[in-house]
A protein has these predicted regions:
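C-terminal substrate-recognition/cap domain of FAD-linked oxidoreductases
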Residues: 58-62, 68, 72-76, 81-171
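FAD-binding subdomain of flavoenzyme oxidoreductases
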Residues: 1-98
């Protein structure tokens, strides 16, 4: 959600069926409106509790020229959080960044027969041109090192990136 925003920010319009059977549409062509509540964001944020979404209009992003993923472990959650804070404060346009604590890593190791170091981990993904991805990743790697982060485990190939993110999704 760092670079592209949350799902709520990427849904432009909806068709919703309410519990009583009424159907209504939200959203429109204008980006801003002062005409009351933003029902699109309200419905998306409710995750299905206010109505059944039958159609939606999404904001689409182009496929980046280059994508790289990395995993980095830290001795403490605070070290990982400080890395996240500094990365965001520096304005680095990171595509994805997620923190997984040591208890979750331990559970993933046991359940999925993995052998990750039992410590907090940051899962990162960088999008852009080859040069910008390289620059972003080097900068974040330096920041992580300043907060006792391990060397990044990298991948630019789709299959390997998916493998790196597997433990995060398994959590």
């Amino acid at each position: 959600a760092v670079r592209y925003g949350t799902m709520r920010e990427n849904v432009l319009g909806l068709e919703v069926v309410l519990a009583n059977g009424n159907i209504f549409k939200t959203g429109g062509r204008s980006k801003k409106s002062a005409a009351g509540y933003d029902l699109t964001k309200l419905i998306v944020g409710s995750e299905g509790t206010l109505g059944l979404i039958t159609q939606l209009t999404l904001k689409l992003q182009g496929i980046p020229e280059s994508i790289s993923a990395a995993i980095c472990s830290f001795p403490t959650v605070n070290d990982a959080v400080q890395t996240v804070i500094q990365t965001i404060q520096m304005g680095i346009p990171i595509a994805r960044m997620e923190l997984v604590d040591s208890q979750t890593i331990e559970a993933c190791n046991e359940y999925f027969k993995e052998n990750m170091l039992v410590s907090p981990h940051l899962f990162l993904e960088f999008h852009g041109s080859e040069n910008s991805v390289k620059e972003q990743s080097e900068t974040v790697s330096e920041i992580a090192t300043n907060f006792s982060g391990s060397n990044f485990e990298w991948s630019s190939k789709s299959e390997q990136r998916n493998k790196l993110w597997k433990n995060r999704h398994n959590a």
